[in-house]
Amino acid sequence: MPVEINGLLNHNISSETHPVPFETFDPEGIARMAKLHDAWGYDKVLVANAAIMPDNFTIAGYVAANTTRLGVMLAHRPGFIPPTMAARMLATLDRLMPGRVGVHIITAASDEETQADGDYQTKVERYDRAKEYISVLRRMWTDKKPFDHEGKWFRFNGGFAAIKPTQGTVPVYFGGMSPAALEVAGEYCDTFATLSDTVAGMTEVVGKVRDAAAPYGRSPRFLMSIRIVIADTEEAAWAQADEIREAVAANMGKLAPNTAAVKADGFKRTAELAARGDRLEKCFWNGINQLRGGQSNSGTLVGTPAQLADALMDYYDAGVSAFILRGFDPVEDVIAIGRDLIPLLRAKVAERDAQLAATEPAMA
């Protein structure tokens, strides 16, 4: 399966090593970063969503206006916008950037944060609502006539989208490690998205999600978000990692705590992973996870382009065929990953797929 390689697009150019105030909204920076990801071979960028963040639908449209081949993975919370309207919004965006839109359905880990937008459902209720929401989205994208719906969470008559996605649907990404999340993922998601982990950890995650999907006859794809430290030599890469740790430590007072992380099952895994040591497996580095107490999705692969490609192939062999790859320098690392790692990883995946195809029995 071809590998999907994505980046992350913020509403300003910042990171733990280059912090700017969260309130800074930088349209020129958004356009610059979108164009960089577009030029350096990324498939999509994740455009995040939270109660205090700028509207990401508007940002996604701005990305579309400033790129030619880049797609977006749009984080979206069910319930704030009715699914009928959201389906039309996503289909419209997908027609503006033909076939390059994915929607990452997120339910939020923190009740307090969702209450800031007037949503007082519990986490379990939000997962239950997500099931119905995704079902309505897909009917809106595929049904050729208006339809009525009366469910637990949504009710409408004559729902219809005259505009349809370019490829008939919009891929649905979903994540979460709680039992309720795995239940939704198994039945509904096209791609299961998760935080950084070791190969052994991801093998466990893949197994759990596949078990949840099996009763529905489904086989979702898997995406992992992981940080990258890349250099010409192994020694230089680890020296750079040490410099990053020092820079983040110096900036800790400028970084907002991720209070929602303490309630998220995925971040609990991150904290447990951080407690296991500084370096794990081939080149997995916990330095920033440890520094931030497991509240940051900052598991990192450190090494040369060849070492990093080999490490990512271990994940590919474990079932992960999509990644969000990002470094710590918000500009230079986008370029370095796109120039030195992405072509190498795509070539290795193509070679592996060709080898597998050659060993499969010929069709009768």
Segments from the language model and where they lie:
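N-terminal beta1-alpha1-beta2 module of alpha/beta enzyme domains
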Residues: 1-67, 167-170
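Catalytic domains of carbohydrate-active enzymes, especially glycoside hydrolases
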Residues: 29-48, 184-192, 314-321
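Short, acidic/polar
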Residues: 22-36, 174-184, 301-315
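Alpha-helix-loop-beta-strand connector modules within alpha/beta enzyme cores
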Residues: 56-74, 129-133, 215-216, 339-353
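Hydrophobic faces of well-ordered beta-strands that scaffold small-molecule active sites
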Residues: 3-9, 45-47, 71-76, 101-105, ...
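An alpha-helical appendage that flanks or caps ligand/catalytic pockets
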Residues: 2-11, 117, 123-166, 197-316, ...
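Conserved, mostly hydrophobic/aromatic
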Residues: 37, 41, 63, 93, ...
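Acidic-and-aromatic substrate-binding clefts and catalytic sites of carbohydrate-active enzymes
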Residues: 47-56, 79-84, 198-204, 230-231, ...
